């Protein structure tokens, strides 16, 4: 009996190809078909037929690809690859509402082991185990019967391809206009179709990565210090905090009814309520905000081999340090001193390869004490990175309850999820306030300033969307509107003639974006170069002209 159960089932090659094509094109594209139903109401027989034609086209395309690969004996490995990739894509699309594109592939490549571990849930392991790994094993386990005639096998496979091509042509003849209209008006639909979404996105990512080895493009070689901010006994020190996944609408400084920024509310900061990000993922936003390119003209491939604002500041003679607690600077700090403080794995600060952001201050006091010239310190925080929001703050910052203490955030109630996310912002508030107090402690030696700017926002289940990374054109504002604030010491305001009341009024009426960071940092640190754009410098219009 057992022997009979363990006996490998056998199919002829054509049947195996059809079965594999059906599973890949239909079973692993449920997410795609669900999204089609949202965009194509089945309110007429015509629309019903259009919808029913889509599985036919998907099946036919996969059938053609697998059949062609069988002539090179690649049908098994290719089918297994499609199954594994399709199962993974479908899980993340259906669970988190993401889109598979180049940015998402970059996010996957840049994901740290700790972040990968945070995504692992029993649901994920079971889903991928059954729909991916088990299905691939079955595809390999099924025995393909040897063809009785090689010519007959070739003819049958040729006929199989021909029938599939004819089906595609028939659908095109009947419904081309419907397809063109549907996909033109819903451009992101195709990014849910597996396995083409993963293949196209991976190739796009690879094409961009190839350009990373191009010669470095230097900018700001004319950089020099403004005489007003140089050769003074009191040096200048600026801290820039790069936030992670903090969305503006949950900042109490932005009018959010919950008190998520109790400390910063007392710090006399200037908050900019209308600030847009350059992207919806760290891999896009961080290199973009440090580049001289505005979002509308941002080129990822150029940013990978071009200097940014930190290079210019360093060239002008200012000491630059980047402390990282978020898996890397995405190229923004490659040519300035930088350190991965997460790797220190400090006790009471780190859990499973991830650390609370307070680790960023390790050794900072000593660094500042030994600093002889002007300095810019960048603190790259892990902030509110999900889905393990509950791991982003120590227990004493669990202000709002009940919380979502799991990485299966889709299983939590809205209240639990928002509570946990808001707790991360309470800890962000603590971190930024701590940096301000650190600067205050060194005001005897330095004229100090601080900027906080988050890389992108976050979705917390609104409209079934979680996390971030959606294409900018369709991403909700919660992923694009980010908190930005500025703190200037009284000494800075007086010494460099900056009117803070003017800044406060300007912040409430003007719209800003991460495009402003480049020139604002140059202006804040007194670096002059032809790349500086006064119109993008937030402080420029509020500087009083000395009589």
From Swiss-Prot:
CDD domains: LptA. PANTHER family: INNER MEMBRANE PROTEIN, PHOSPHOETHANOLAMINE TRANSFERASE EPTA. Keywords: Antibiotic resistance, Cell inner membrane, Cell membrane, Lipid A biosynthesis, Lipid biosynthesis, Lipid metabolism, Lipopolysaccharide biosynthesis, Membrane, Transferase, Transmembrane, Transmembrane helix. GO terms for cellular component: plasma membrane. The chain crosses the membrane at residues 10-30, 48-68, 80-100, 124-144, 155-175. Residues 31-47, 101-123, 176-547 are periplasmic. Its main location: membrane. It is an enzyme of class 2 (transferase). Belongs to the phosphoethanolamine transferase family. EptA subfamily. The gene is eptA. GO terms for biological process: lipid A biosynthetic process; lipopolysaccharide biosynthetic process; lipopolysaccharide core region biosynthetic process; response to antibiotic. GO terms for molecular function: phosphotransferase activity, phosphate group as acceptor. The lineage of its organism: Bacteria, Pseudomonadati, Pseudomonadota, Gammaproteobacteria, Enterobacterales. It holds the Pfam family Sulfatase. It is a multi-pass membrane protein. It is found in: Cell inner membrane. Its EC number is 2.7.-.-. The keyword Plastid does not apply. Has been isolated as a 91 kDa complex containing ZipA-EptA and an unidentified 24 kDa protein. This is Phosphoethanolamine transferase EptA. Residues 1-9, 69-79, 145-154 are cytoplasmic. The keyword Lipid metabolism applies. Catalyzes the addition of a phosphoethanolamine moiety to the lipid A. The phosphoethanolamine modification is required for resistance to polymyxin. Induction: The eptA-basRS operon is positively autoregulated by BasR under high iron or aluminum concentration conditions.
